[in-house]
Regions:
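Short beta-strand edge/turn micro-motifs at domain boundaries
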Residues: 2-17, 110-112, 123-124, 130-184
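Core segments of small alpha/beta cavity-forming domains
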Residues: 6-96, 184
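Conserved NTP-handling cores and scaffolds of large molecular machines
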Residues: 44, 51, 75, 79-82, ...
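Residues in flexible loops and secondary-structure boundaries
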Residues: 70, 98, 103, 121, ...
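Short, charged low-complexity intrinsically disordered segments located at boundaries
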Residues: 72-79, 99-107, 176-180
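Surface-exposed, charged secondary-structure patches
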Residues: 83-127, 135
Length: 184
């Protein structure tokens, strides 16, 4: 990639998660901070690309069942109306590693990343006109979301997404590096 990750000072929460992640990474290197941030960045970009391409098959491979069902309904609604939602990432996303639950149980083990990104986001109708979303002045938007990632067959996928305000609890949730550690 031509552009590397955005460098910034990590938050206190991110430093605490990274310390716990170093312990978790001894058991599974995919939990290491650099590995999680790289995987989250790749996944975020791939999800945006697949959404822009209206590629439900690719989306299905990258997200959990509930999220896929919700997105599939939205894509079908766009198609029914003759609309296409276009999204394009502007620059690199900022990824903060803010949550960790690693007990060795694949059903509950997860990481949480906070994503801050700028996107060009608009809808094109059947006639090729660009439709603005209500309440927006232009096509450029900034998203701040908490993505919960889980693993399946050794690959991270998006289990859930919370918008900035609804995801704030993620910054308070317990950090668990292993089945024997329980740091609050």
């Amino acid at each position: 990639a031509a552009h590397g990750p955005v460098h910034r000072k990590p938050s206190k929460r991110e430093r605490r998660v990274e310390l716990a992640a170093a312990e978790a990474a001894e058991d599974d290197p995919e939990y290491a901070p650099d590995a999680v941030r790289a995987s989250a960045t790749t996944l975020f970009k791939a999800v945006q690309r697949a959404w822009d391409d209206q590629d439900g098959i690719t989306l299905r491979a990258m997200v959990g069942r509930d999220l896929y069902e919700e997105w599939s309904r939205r894509l079908q609604d766009f198609e029914r109306r003759g609309w296409r939602n276009r999204v394009q990432l502007l620059g690199e996303p900022t990824i903060e590693y803010v949550g960790l639950n690693h007990t060795g149980d694949p059903l509950t083990d997860h990481v949480v990343v906070k994503i801050d990104a700028r996107l060009k986001d608009y809808v094109v109708d059947r006639s090729g006109r660009r439709l603005k979303r209500s309440g927006r002045l232009g096509e450029t938007t900034r998203i701040r979301e908490f993505w919960t990632l889980q693993r399946n067959d050794g690959r991270w996928y998006v289990a859930s997404i919370e918008q900035d305000k609804e995801g704030q609890h993620q910054l308070e949730d317990k950090i668990v590096a292993s089945a024997w550690a329980d740091e609050t």
